[in-house]
């Protein structure tokens, strides 16, 4: 097949390939053979890196709500602000400390640049804290060295070392606070690896990194510049060359400029990282920080404990939306409104069969469904494990098929339609959506079903030539049955009698006397619930003249439900012939 694509005409020549800017060579890479088996150390940076990117930065009340959420979910390292950058951030750090809001097993993290008055102010904010991470950073990239700082490599290294020494100096003012240091060569992805490791190792030496006093070296993809495998190569290279490695907690801080922040974080973790910084639902500058929800639940669906509680994902989403004043997109992995929803007919059918297989497997194992291995097509996680219901799993529109329609009827109304009846009713829905368009809600689906099969006071309009009232049966010595039925025929009350080898056959005899040619082709029934007072549903496939249609009947009496189903099929055939 000929490729018909043409040049875009866009000025792509203005952009330099990453490999022509930064060399990352790792021919003996080992990370592709690694498998993730446990969660990394997490650090949530919603209150600083996320907050600075908001159109309307969080108020103190919204910050506290976000902090409480992060603590409740299980995050043990939480970046809470840049206290030297604003009075608001400083006051929030003080509020957390003085109000005893920080649990003993949670470490707050504060950010600072490498200038003395900023570092001094940072330490002032931490007075009274039990433990804290002081996060020092300066930009090291080729581009920023040239256009922002106008400094050579040695000049930028001096900035980092001066900042590290000042941190050690002011550490003495916090004798009762356990300080852990973190250093970030900002714009790491735009920095030569040899230079990045030179700066990081020099800073780690000032901080006296050791197995007993570990230092966090954080390698940010401040701007995502290449494919995730390149980031992973750079992380493995750094992991091999940082020293002392046992004294280093290697941390990642991916952004999402190319849309691959999650992949970069996962591959970087495989490449030797120990820790990942990010935000819930990927908030952050430009296209955002890496999404901690996606990262955590990607582990969960692989059978790995994320060490974070996502069991009420809707509450997490609502809180984040309130605090950030930004919506979480409907397609956001795991947390969006539509992520567990199937509109496609083939998908719906597979999901329906998956649920049925799950129930069979659980019954065979003598277990509750919640205790067996989750295996349902198109659903990588059980929505109930995240606090969701199954209500939104299947929704009906013009792309839907019998599986979705059948699932909704069974899940919401306990009606388990035979397969051919599913096909017939899905055709009714298809004609409706083709004509009207849009989605059919569960309530609308039920209304359409009633209007089609169960004309009653709840139907949109009364229709049908026949309506069945009371019945009485008599059985003779030969097993034959006589049915005395009270019917409404064309609006008039009549009493009719028919005979046959059962109640359905006797009703067919009555209808034949009335000039209706009807035969039963298939029949099934089931209880709608358990217990002695359960309603029964009957499904009867009838040939009425040249038309083959299904009828449905619901009644507390099984025989009555089957008779109503025959009347339903006959009425539908007559209406169909008249339309």
From Swiss-Prot:
- Segments forming a coiled coil: none
Can you list the GO cellular component terms from the UniProt entry? cytoplasm
Task: Give all residue intervals belonging to the Pyruvate carboxyltransferase domain.
Answer: 40-314
Q: Which GO terms describe its biological process?
A: L-leucine biosynthetic process
**Which SUPFAM superfamilies did the record assign?**
2-isopropylmalate synthase LeuA, allosteric (dimerisation) domain, Aldolase, post-HMGL domain-like
- Please name the Pfam families in this protein's record: HMGL-like, IPMS_D2, LeuA_dimer
Q: How does it assemble?
A: Homodimer.
Write the protein's name: 2-isopropylmalate synthase
Q: In which organism is this protein found?
A: Pseudarthrobacter chlorophenolicus (strain ATCC 700700 / DSM 12829 / CIP 107037 / JCM 12360 / KCTC 9906 / NCIMB 13794 / A6)
What's the gene? Answer: leuA
